[in-house]
Curated annotation (Swiss-Prot):
The gene is pheS. Binds 2 magnesium ions per tetramer. The lineage of its organism: Bacteria, Pseudomonadati, Pseudomonadota, Betaproteobacteria, Burkholderiales. It comes from Acidovorax ebreus (strain TPSY) (Diaphorobacter sp. (strain TPSY)). Mg(2+) binds at residue 271. HAMAP family: Phe_tRNA_synth_alpha1. Keywords: Aminoacyl-tRNA synthetase, ATP-binding, Cytoplasm, Ligase, Magnesium, Metal-binding, Nucleotide-binding, Protein biosynthesis. This is Phenylalanine--tRNA ligase alpha subunit. It catalyses: tRNA(Phe) + L-phenylalanine + ATP = L-phenylalanyl-tRNA(Phe) + AMP + diphosphate + H(+). It comes from the Bacteria. The keyword ATP-binding applies.
Amino acid sequence: MNELDSLVTSARESFARSATPAELENAKAQFLGKSGRLTELMKGMAQLSPEEKKTRGAAINVAKQAVEAALAARRQELADAELQAQLKAEALDVTLPGRQRGRGGLHPVSLTLERIERIFGSMGFEVADGPEIETDWFNFTALNTPEDHPARSMHDTFYVEGGTPEAPNLLRTHTSPMQVRYAVQHVKKHRGLIDAGQAMPEIRVIAPGRTYRVDSDATHSPMFHQCEGLWIGENVSFKDLKVVFTDFCKTFFESDDLVLRFRPSFFPFTEPSAEIDIQFQSGPLAGKWLEVAGSGQVHPNVVRNMGLDPERFIGFAFGMGPDRLTMLRYGVNDLRLFFDGDIRFLSQFQ
């Protein structure tokens, strides 16, 4: 074996011993670097004759090509080995069971709202929807709220841009404006029957949704939910209110021994007005009177603002807080827990 064959064999063995790309580069420098063995052989050709240079140069080039081929082959082997190691590390066992996603669910207040809509829907009530940014007229004036009523102050109501000093816009403080909007459209639709003295289809509607007031403590939130109800016809009485709301409460709380109490109260939009309390006969709240709603016979001025004659049409309205009903149903004492977004708490109600 001559000198060049020995050099090629030595290079191949050195490359084969290189276990990493860095070691391979060091081995390459020993043979192909500026001071490598092949480079030194080429420098030594300077003392040779032209004929010897030709023969010697051709032999050195053949050896160099063999070394470079061995180097390229080893580089590919190391790259393949690195790829296989990476694939092995990232390999997926398709026989393993998949990771199950946690099951989501409705918010407890949403569950309550659906329950309310379902119960009143079974009684023939429709569901109304409307804007959360309301006009002063629909939120206060149409509901017989005096200009100097405390509820109109900035301490109780969130006013927003877009209105005028005479007709400001605000975040609705209750969902009663939706009742008025619904009633106005209902009256327009059946105006021909009304003017002809014929019977108009009764207005039976509930208006659930978000409302806003400047208030925040354990039992109040700046944003809270309300559900208002309205039933207007020619022969609707306070007795109907008592029957409807009693049936609702017994169905909602799934309790036949529930007792309701109507306490005289005052609201600008109803006359007479009453607070509605309930009393459980069993369970942790047994014997306690708990306020759940306000109610009353719709004030003649409100009936008139709906486009109806209060001498002919009469009805009742009620308003309750789904948030409070949710607290009572699930035994939660702090309203803010429902809106903190803690999945650990909310997941208990699924």
